Amino acid sequence: MFGFFKKDKAVEVEVPTQVPAHIGIIMDGNGRWAKKRMQPRVFGHKAGMEALQAVTKAANKLGVKVITVYAFSTENWTRPDQEVKFIMNLPVEFYDNYVPELHANNVKIQMIGETDRLPKQTFEALTKAEELTKNNTGLILNFALNYGGRAEITQALKLISQDVLDAKINPGDITEELIDNYLFTQHLPKDLRDPDLIIRTSGELRLSNFLPWQGAYSELYFTDTLWPDFDEAALQEAILAYNRRHRRFGGV
């Protein structure tokens, strides 16, 4: 399942032979990273944005097709107002300082979540990024903003119920495939909607309402590395761990 590259006859270096097509990332640990440096939490969020740029470029180079990043959850509104305001301004800075390079590297930017609740400047920055990169054919960087997995499924069920009432579909038409077409990830190619691998940084061992439908059969990788310290080498290690596993999808 994985190969070896001989670096100098004496040393064998394991390299991945299978790259996950879709990687989900729960970018956790920005606040703790800042605290360790006696800096405010927002300092960590800024460093986390720089890490995202580096990891996206590395993933694109490795041949990953989609990265979905958990940028802001529906529960994160309970954080201090100043921190929320800072986070909501990061997409503006991201568009100004990072999107041009990603665009030059053929990266396509998209967003999922209840985006109608986002502040105007946040929504406009991401919409501009989507418009600028819409014809790119490389890696898709999928921002989950104001996203919650349960809310996503609830909204899908409401839409399906309305379509049943409007006689657009029959109850017997409701299948897993149909539900999949009502989720936020419906804009992705069908074979790329479900993450092959979900990474969570910072040592926390939970998924926190991230892609519960799409991640049903995802391989999970937890690392103690705080998100701002997660780099290309850390990404490669996660992919190596993925390579060592046998995905059964309920079989043997």
What are these regions (language model features)?
Residues 1-252:
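Flexible, compositionally biased loop and terminal segments
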